[in-house]
Amino acid sequence: MVQKFQSPVRVYKYPFELVMKAYERRFPTCPQMPIVLDCEVIKDESLEDGAKRNTSRRCKLAVDAPYIFKKLIGVDHVYFLQHNFLDLANRTLSIEAVNESFSSRIEIFERCRYYAHPDNSEWTCFDQSATLDIKNFFGFEHSMEKMGMKQYTQTTLKGKEIIEFFIGQLREEGITHVERWTSPSDATKSPTLDQASDQQHSILLDGDFIARSLGQLSPMQESKLLELRKMLDGVDDLERVPSYQTILRFLAARDWHVSQAYAMLCDSLRWRREHRIDALLAEYSKPAVVVEHFPGGWHHLDKDGRPVYILRLGHMDVKGLLKSLGMDGLLRLALHICEEGIQKINESAERLEKPVLNWSLLVDLEGLSMRHLWRPGIKALLNIIETVERNYPETMGRVLVVRAPRVFPIAWTIVSAFIDEHTRSKFLFYGPDCAHMKDGLAQYLDEEIVPDFLGGPCKTMIHEGGLVPKTLYKMNSLEDHDDEVTAELPTTAAAQALVPGKRLSANQQHDHRNLYKSVDLKAGFAHELLIRNEDPKSVLTWDFDVMRNDLHFTLYRVTQELPEKNDSAVSYFDLQDFVEGVNYFREEPTLICRHKESVQGSHVMHHNDSYLMHWFSPSGAQLNVFYEVLSSANYKGSMTSLQSAFSSNSSAASSVQSR
């Protein structure tokens, strides 16, 4: 396979003639390039009254490889042929180099160009490209490919340094200017620089632009960036070419695999066009429920210049927002935040005059409970995560998660499987200890911008959140959101989807069909669900809506074996010798649940016993109910630093009601 390399344009802020004077001093050898052992001039001719000069050299290079490799191939050095074509009239130098040694087994071709900057005649541009085609090299093809990449990187890094060194040497000798070439008859100079036209877009990607806008990139990364940029020129329906910052993010997201990044970027560009994302900032208007009840907003800049977005997730009424906005509305809100983030990143980079490529997220989890793990809400969150990761890769620089409560390890287990591993590494977690948390935040936020709700001095303009009034709901019941079915238990697919590290789509893990059961309770009767636990420390979670009248809910642990019930109207409490404190125990206190309330909760099942969920209504009621058992293997050891701050005797979370 032919390997191709391409450098961006390097700009020397010196005239072409002075750069050529410095370039000549690197021959036959120079200390900055010890790999070059000697250069012999084999041809040197001057043409057109000295306007052109063609020089060929045979260069002897040391083999920069392990000793055993050099012994196997039988040589300590190799030879290259270099051909220089200097055009003083047009102020260009083209350099071509090919390998003489092992030319039947490997083909190396390098092309470099020096030319006057098209926009500033007092500056000089340099670009470099190379191809490496290894046909057969004694079974060491992969090793040769790695050495070729290493050599390209070294020569690219050294090239500008060498020219700068010799320009400094000339300056010390009092040479700061070299006259331009003129013909003996004082003829008008030829038009300049036709060769630069084939890389017109690369002029913008010079070394200064990279340092100022993209940060430190290796020569190989620069080459891949240019390769992907050129590939986009061939996209027919491309309305506008993405910025180099965007191209860089997609490359980084695909670990610098150009073909994968190209496919991902093209898919994203189609998605943006289909959904009019480019017009989102201008067209989107925040609904009233977002303005009044969404606890998130932009803050200041962190210490690295990244814009900071604060989300008080623990104060968010997930169910209320989802029922008011719908899945699409919540996704559109998230996309609007992402578009704002890109805008603020660019503004920060321009203002600070340094590379800023992503933003930071500060997530406050105070108040997080099992109500935030409402299944449709989880589905919406995972849909947002998948969409953002596909279309806004590497825009999240750091995620600071603060005041994480005891329920958080369960939530993290569910959600983290859908977050890219590289993105997960950007999460930093702080427990409920605010004093310790402030010290930790000081590494990333200036003290004066630490939010007041975290004990800092800075007031934020972020809404407190709270429950969304049901008058704003577009959907009045779970039936409107999930198809009702009669299946009482969820399939095992949900449990299988919670295997740590396994990434599935949101639809695979959180298909809401077959989850909720509608139950009619007659006056004075109970509804009971028996869970036989064979996995100590697994977590029982529940979510139900009271659709009519009030009811009582209690969780019991049963130590004796209970028979299967054939009649749902019969309660286990009607059995003889069924005595509280003897063979059953109240694990959660009885909760009175009012009409239209939504209840979410969880309980760590420490014992290898049965657990009984019990609903009772004195006057008859209706509810929609879902429960699930999370295996202990899915969260045990996860977030241990957070769990250590919790009481070992406390349950994972108590029931939480939202009205």
UniProtKB/Swiss-Prot annotation:
Residues 3-175 form the PRELI/MSF1 domain. Pfam families: CRAL_TRIO, CRAL_TRIO_N, PRELI. The modification Phosphoserine is found at residue 477. Residues 286-462 form the CRAL-TRIO domain. GO terms for cellular component: cytoplasm; mitochondrion. It comes from the Eukaryota. It is found in: Mitochondrion. SUPFAM superfamilies: CRAL/TRIO domain, CRAL/TRIO N-terminal domain, Supernatant protein factor (SPF), C-terminal domain. InterPro entries: CRAL-TRIO_dom, CRAL-TRIO_dom_sf, CRAL/TRIO_N_dom, CRAL/TRIO_N_dom_sf, GOLD_dom, GOLD_dom_sf, PRELI/MSF1_dom, SEC14/CRAL-TRIO_domain. Restricted to the developing gut and central nervous system (CNS). Keywords: Mitochondrion, Phosphoprotein. Residues 512-631 form the GOLD domain. PROSITE patterns: CRAL_TRIO, GOLD, PRELI_MSF1. This is Protein real-time.
